[in-house]
Amino acid sequence: DSVYVGGSMFGARAYANNFSEEELLEAIDYVHLHGKKLFMTVNTLLKEQELEEKLYAYLLPYYKRGLDAVIVQDVGVLRFVRKHFPDLPIHASTQMTITGIDGAKFMEEQGVQRVVTSRELSMKEVQQIAEHTNVEIESFVHGALCYCYSGQCLFSSFLGGRSGNRGQCAQ
């Protein structure tokens, strides 16, 4: 019932054919026309200069068009979005490495609507988080499984000079 997309910046799939601004705005309209939701990724680590000079202008057109949620990794981005777009729902990315109840509760306290749990968790661990928090829970059940904990990668950078934390995973 929802579509997940990456835009032209700050997504963990830097080498993918991501949406341009025009395409993403059209996608928001199209998805809403069919009664569905669109969630956009901002799931990399941002530098201070990027937060101050780029993130607001990047998110603003999508926010105005009715973006349903932003998926974030960086707690600085979470704080920034909460401050500048207070009614925009935020989802904590699997890249945020939420591995337990306390992490999920902390995200809940920060106003996060949904936690995408770490891919490395068992079904029982995910169930425990769901039973002890009030946030929506989402989990990956297939796909890539990183050598490191998701969102904590230094391996790609070490081996290939490409930062997985900036969307350039060597996987």
Please describe what each predicted stretch is.
Residues 100-102:
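Conserved nucleotide-cofactor-binding alpha/beta core module
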